[in-house]
């Protein structure tokens, strides 16, 4: 016997319809490529999304055709998010920071039919166009630009493209399991792999994000996603904010500290989301300009382990609560967020602060476990380290166009992380499996060493890698970037570890570099560092 309740499919079109119907006047401020600020609202986004959906449908695109973007966080990109998926096509957001060869591979592998792009990327698109085998239409995201039209034959313009559409377009009825968006993993080796999300997984992910003990956006929030919309759907923020009716600030291409502080103060941002490297610049600017970040109540930090010193500065200097989060492209990306339990209020304040440093617990919809090398489940005791496995409603089961290559083990996905879990489900990422340092049979967490190093006031940032050692197999090496105007030496930095970790875990050496090599999503390329410094202890 089935329950006697209505069935309505979980579709992305229902999110934008809800936002327009019940939160239509909620404002959205969008920084343009040129630097000006446009103001719209959810009703305006919904109208243009429908217009776009109607134009794409009338163009004769086959259902599930891929439509790509090379774009920053702005209102046109937000309209494309809903117009493409809502009309039954697949939104393919592409990271413009990839090498041109990777962009060509991704566009061709995805078999994209249309490419929307911001004016910033006109030279890039001009260069790769001859190598694109499936793209039929190129659309610059803006008004007509005759100079741009002269550079690319047949170039179309978004504002004209959408103006011909129908704001009364009816969204198609779709199976909720229909593919909605596509994102390729950044990967530090080999070609990127595609992760294909569904309408169902996206809406469920939004429900998960909006639970109070997760991120919990509300109609009273002004949300600024600094995480790019070309990276894992901006952590699902554009969808979750439509569900909650939050106002949004879309920061455009300039993510430097001065620009972000200005947006927070001007538009009274309450929640901002991004990776640690972004917040380093923002905090430095706030200190220099004397901004109190008065409106900001929460930062959500993921993409890499958040240094405890950063959490402390947000908390103690600005009264901002930091929600430490973890996830990955294969998880849409939400895996865990760190929110305290009721019992933690009885802990000493320092113990409460310490608890907030780990990656937190999964929301409903995600399950975690750790296993040993033989696949045996390990205890949740907060001490035992193992390979982290996940499963859930918004976790992939195969990569795009690689369905014949199984990646699950008994229904679980191996994340490639080494972690611990405690009895309450709080997770601490100890390292990536490939980055953990194996020294004399013991494991040393590079993340733990990095968190200590970046707390030193004379360092801008740092990475720790394992390098070959004639006796211990591997030993940790600290690769450091000096803060502007500072001149720390090796002895000073190594002494900073005293009393914070066991002596045998302290890095053997320090090398200084001008900048750390980063991949397209801002993560440190430790493989590059290992190759560069592999002989530093043996040469």
UniProtKB/Swiss-Prot annotation:
Residues forming coiled coils: none
Effect of disrupting the coding gene: Cells lacking this gene show a delayed growth on methylmercaptopropionate (MMPA).
GO molecular function (one): metal ion binding
Biological processes per GO annotation: fatty acid metabolic process
Site positions per UniProt: Plays an important role in catalysis: 523
Free-text activity regulation comment from the record: Activated by LiCl and NH(4)Cl. Inhibited by dimethylsulfoniopropionate (DMSP). MMPA concentrations above 2 mM relieve the DMSP inhibition and 80% of activity is regained at an MMPA concentration of 8 mM.
Residues binding ATP, per UniProt: 231, 303, 324-325, 329, 359, 417, 432, 523
Enzyme class: ligase
Gene3D superfamilies the UniProt entry points to: 3.30.300.30, N-terminal domain of ligase-like
Family membership: Belongs to the ATP-dependent AMP-binding enzyme family.
Main function: Involved in the assimilation of dimethylsulphoniopropionate (DMSP), an important compound in the fixation of carbon in marine phytoplankton. Catalyzes the ATP-dependent ligation of methylmercaptopropionate (MMPA) and CoA to yield methylmercaptopropionate-CoA (MMPA-CoA). It is also active with short-chain-fatty-acid (carboxylic acids up to six carbons in length).
Record-given protein name: 3-methylmercaptopropionyl-CoA ligase
Organism, scientific name: Ruegeria pomeroyi (strain ATCC 700808 / DSM 15171 / DSS-3)
């Amino acid at each position: 016997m089935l329950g006697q309740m209505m069935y309505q499919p979980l579709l992305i079109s229902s999110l934008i319809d809800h936002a327009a119907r019940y939160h239509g006047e909620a404002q959205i401020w969008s920084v343009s490529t040129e630097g000006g600020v446009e103001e719209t609202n959810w009703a305006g986004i919904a109208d243009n999304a429908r217009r776009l959906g109607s134009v794409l449908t009338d163009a004769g695109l086959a259902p599930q055709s891929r439509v790509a973007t090379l774009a920053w966080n702005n209102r046109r990109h937000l309209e494309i998010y809903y117009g493409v998926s809502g009309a039954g096509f697949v939104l393919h957001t592409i990271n413009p920071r990839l090498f041109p060869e990777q962009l060509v591979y991704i566009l061709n592998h995805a078999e994209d039919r249309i490419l929307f792009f911001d004016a910033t990327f006109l030279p890039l698109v001009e260069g790769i166009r001859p190598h694109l085998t499936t793209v039929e239409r190129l659309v610059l995201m803006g008004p007509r630009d005759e100079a741009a039209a002269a550079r690319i034959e047949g170039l179309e313009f978004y504002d004209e493209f959408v103006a011909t559409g129908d704001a009364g377009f009816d969204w198609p009825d779709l199976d909720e399991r229909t593919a909605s968006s596509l994102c390729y993993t950044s990967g530090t080796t080999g070609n990127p792999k595609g992760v294909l999300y569904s309408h169902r997984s996206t809406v469920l992910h939004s429900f998960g994000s909006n639970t109070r003990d997760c991120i919990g956006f509300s109609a009273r929030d002004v949300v600024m996603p600094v995480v790019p919309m070309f990276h894992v759907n901006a952590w699902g923020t554009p969808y979750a904010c439509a569900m909650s009716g939050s106002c949004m600030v879309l920061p455009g291409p300039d993510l430097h500290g001065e620009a972000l502080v200005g947006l927070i103060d001007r538009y009274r941002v309450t929640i901002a989301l991004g990776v640690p490297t972004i917040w380093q610049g923002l905090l430095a600017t706030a200190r220099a300009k004397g901004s109190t970040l008065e409106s900001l109540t929460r930062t959500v930090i993921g993409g890499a382990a958040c240094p405890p010193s950063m959490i402390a500065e947000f908390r103690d200097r600005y009264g901002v609560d930091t929600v430490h989060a973890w996830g990955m492209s294969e998880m849409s990306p939400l895996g865990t967020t760190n929110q305290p339990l009721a019992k933690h209020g009885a802990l000493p304040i320092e113990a409460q602060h310490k608890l907030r440093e780990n990656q937190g617990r999964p929301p409903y919809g995600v399950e975690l476990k750790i296993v040993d090398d033989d696949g045996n489940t390990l205890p949740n005791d907060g001490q035992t380290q193992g390979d982290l496995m996940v499963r859930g409603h918004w976790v992939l089961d195969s990569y795009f166009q690689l369905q014949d290559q199984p990646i699950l083990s008994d229904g679980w996905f191996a994340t490639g992380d080494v972690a611990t879990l405690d009895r309450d489900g709080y997770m601490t990422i100890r390292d990536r499996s490939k980055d953990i340092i194996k020294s004399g049979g013991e494991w040393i967490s590079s993340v733990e060493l990095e968190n200590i190093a970046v707390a030193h006031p004379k360092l801008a940032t740092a990475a720790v890698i394992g390098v070959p050692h004639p006796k211990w197999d591997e030993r940790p090496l600290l690769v450091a970037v000096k803060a502007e105007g500072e001149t720390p030496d090796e002895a000073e930095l190594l002494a900073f570890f005293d009393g914070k970790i066991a002596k045998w875990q302290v890095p053997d050496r320090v090398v200084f570099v001008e900048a750390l090599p980063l991949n397209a999503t801002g993560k440190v390329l430790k493989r590059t560092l290992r190759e560069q410094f592999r002989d530093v202890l043996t040469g």
